[in-house]
Amino acid sequence: MYQLRFEQKIPTNIENVWNFISDPRNLKKITPSYMGFQITNEPIAEKMYAGMIIAYKVTPLLSIPMQWVTEITHVQEMEYFVDEQRIGPYTLWHHQHRISEIEGGTLMQDIVSYKPPFGPLGI
């Protein structure tokens, strides 16, 4: 298994950040445009909740569309939420989205634990 960690400082209060990142309708806004991200199970709720299923299509490689389904497995208001892949390209995908107050704004951390397909050949 592998892990990626990203963090960024956002110069606004934690409430603004939480309200933005916990609204699944904003996923397209925060996904790089080259991915061709499109939610396919609309209409979708305005706030993420544990048990929420989000189905979407992306075109990450050679413009080949790929279906992906994630479940929001944990939500702690104003702190974090976790999405886990249910259908998609990885053997395992566990993505934590964490926020915390810091001086001058909010620290947002993404922690992605994943296992590529095809064992050692999928690296």
Across the structure, where does each feature detected by a protein language model lie?
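Short, surface-exposed coil-to-beta transition loops
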Residues: 3-5, 65-69, 91-96
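Phosphate-binding glycine-rich loops and adjacent basic patches that engage nucleotide phosphates
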Residues: 14-15, 31-35, 56-62, 97-109
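Beta-strand/loop substructures that line and gate deep hydrophobic ligand-binding cavities in soluble
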Residues: 85-123
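Hydrophobic pocket/interface hotspot
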Residues: 16-21, 27, 54-56, 72, ...
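Hydrophobic ligand-binding cavity/cleft-lining segments
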Residues: 1-49
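Glycine-rich portal/gate segments that line the openings of hydrophobic small-molecule binding cavities
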Residues: 39-87, 104
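Generic structural detector for well-ordered beta-strands
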Residues: 5-11, 38, 57, 71, ...
